[in-house]
From Swiss-Prot:
Keywords: Chloroplast, Membrane, Photosynthesis, Photosystem I, Plastid, Thylakoid, Transmembrane, Transmembrane helix. The lineage of its organism: Eukaryota, Viridiplantae, Streptophyta, Embryophyta, Tracheophyta. InterPro entries: PSI_PsaJ, PSI_PsaJ_sf. This is Photosystem I reaction center subunit IX. One of its GO terms (cellular component) is chloroplast thylakoid membrane. May help in the organization of the PsaE and PsaF subunits. It comes from Populus trichocarpa (Western balsam poplar). Belongs to the PsaJ family. Its main location: plastid. The gene is psaJ.
Length: 44
């Protein structure tokens, strides 16, 4: 039961950090390349 409580208290923190960093990354990409359908750094 203690392990379940630990998991339930850690998972929201990890997911909040993950989704927050993902949102920040997407915001920064859209700031440097607005309305881009293809990104220059993915084209080889």
């Amino acid at each position: 039961m203690r392990d379940l409580k630990t998991y339930l208290s850690v998972a929201p923190v990890i997911s909040t950090l993950w989704f927050g960093s993902l949102a920040g990354l997407l915001i920064e990409i859209n700031r440097f390349f607005p309305d881009a359908l293809t990104f220059p750094f993915f084209s080889f």
